[in-house]
Amino acid sequence: MKKLLFAIPLVVPFYSHSAETVESCLAKPHTENSFTNVWKDDKTLDRYANYEGCLWNATGVVVCTGDETQCYGTWVPIGLAIPENEGGGSEGGGSEGGGSEGGGTKPPEYGDTPIPGYTYINPLDGTYPPGTEQNPANPNPSLEESQPLNTFMFQNNRFRNRQGALTVYTGTVTQGTDPVKTYYQYTPVSSKAMYDAYWNGKFRDCAFHSGFNEDPFVCEYQGQSSDLPQPPVNAGGGSGGGSGGGSEGGGSEGGGSEGGGSEGGGSGGGSGSGDFDYEKMANANKGAMTENADENALQSDAKGKLDSVATDYGAAIDGFIGDVSGLANGNGATGDFAGSNSQMAQVGDGDNSPLMNNFRQYLPSLPQSVECRPYVFGAGKPYEFSIDCDKINLFRGVFAFLLYVATFMYVFSTFANILRNKES
């Protein structure tokens, strides 16, 4: 008896329920972490895990171990944790034992027909006015680039709650010509939103918030199982206990991490592997790289840096030209040439010696113009004659014009020949 009393504190916390609510779970921040006991949805290929009483969905680039039961990524809370002991293994067992759909009696809350006193809701029966809360007379469909999260299947239709309305997947729509983009279309079918409070694949509870009725209507709901999420995807074997054995079957729905049921026998197990979703990873990378991109800010930053570099280079070039000019004109060695004062002091007058004076002796003596004087032939002779300056200046002008024209034609012909050779 003492041993039994000693074991009670160990058993009670293990089976205690979390005090989390849907609102508190959704308010939790995203976390980049590695979670264990991960399962994957076969249809959407999304990965899920229970942590601290909440259900988490892996987003972004997800890296998993070989058996895909431990994954690293950006985990986002999407609702309450899925109970891990509600039907497992091969779903066999004894009376009220292993599995909600096993060999024993089905628990009434998981029945396929409504329980007396409970309300059965069919979202497709048209009893609710179509449309959205914003515009009930015009149900505008929403277009999604990829299949959204938090959808559920009912009567072979995929539903989603959006902006207080229940929407149904109505196929794909293409838009644009270059490129052509394909969208997933969800059309409102009711002004009431539905949610599954337990995320266990059986819609036990639903709440309808109507745009036409301020009071929310809460009901018990009996329907088909959900496709997202439906733990465990990698369901393993295991048999429920004997008569009365197991709370609802062996294994934590095939997880294998906690052995048998909460009170019954059976060993959880199993493993699974799936295909890597390259498209989903590409979309996640694209979103992560572009979500904070500000084209105007990037252009402004690049322009500012280029202007700064250009200003620095311009100042350096102007300073160097000034130093060379001062050195050539005898104003002393400054700036980049200040370090050569000691060597230049040994030459002439040091840094005050204009360098140009040393080169002028090597320059050719160019002809200088003189004042025009009349040209006289045979001065003092009987055949003496002269040419006045006005005629000489006229000849100079005409001859200079001919030289200019000839020079222009020569230069033009030279460049034209170069261009012709390049084209050929």
Curated annotation (Swiss-Prot):
Residues 83-147, 222-279 are annotated as: Disordered. Coiled coil: none annotated. Interacts with G6P; this interaction is required for proper integration of G3P and G6P into the virion. Interacts with G8P. Interacts with the tip of the host pilus. Interacts (via N-terminus) with host TolA. Interacts (via transmembrane domain) with host TolQ (via 2nd and 3rd transmembrane domains); this interaction allows the phage translocation across the host inner membrane. Interacts (via transmembrane domain) with host TolR (via transmembrane domain); this interaction allows the phage translocation across the host inner membrane. Plays essential roles both in the penetration of the viral genome into the bacterial host via pilus retraction and in the extrusion process. During the initial step of infection, G3P mediates adsorption of the phage to its primary receptor, the tip of host F-pilus. Attachment of the phage causes pilus retraction bringing the viral particle into close proximity of the host cell inner membrane. Belongs to the inovirus G3P protein family. This is Attachment protein G3P. GO terms for biological process: adhesion receptor-mediated virion attachment to host cell; entry receptor-mediated virion attachment to host cell; viral extrusion; virion attachment to host cell pilus. Consists of 3 domains (N1/D1, N2/D2, and CT) separated by glycine-rich repeats and a C-terminal transmembrane segment. The N2 domain interacts with the F pilus, whereas the N1 domain forms a complex with the C-terminal domain of TolA at later stages of the infection process. The C-terminal domain is required for release of viral particles from the host bacterial membrane and proper integration of G3P and G6P proteins in the virion. Residues 1-18 form the signal peptide. Its main location: virion. Keywords: Capsid protein, Disulfide bond, Host membrane, Host-virus interaction, Membrane, Signal, Transmembrane, Transmembrane helix, Viral attachment to host adhesion receptor, Viral attachment to host cell, Viral attachment to host cell pilus, Viral attachment to host entry receptor, Viral extrusion, Viral penetration into host cytoplasm, Viral penetration into host cytoplasm via pilus retraction, Viral release from host cell, Virion, Virus entry into host cell. Residues 253-262 are annotated as: Not essential for gene 3 function. Disulfide bonds join 25-54, 64-71, 206-219. One of its GO terms (cellular component) is host cell membrane. It is a single-pass type I membrane protein. The chain crosses the membrane at residues 398-418. Residues 275-424 are annotated as: CT. Residues 86-104 are annotated as: G1 (Gly-rich linker). Residues 105-141 are annotated as: Hinge. It is found in: Virion; Host membrane. The keyword Coiled coil does not apply.
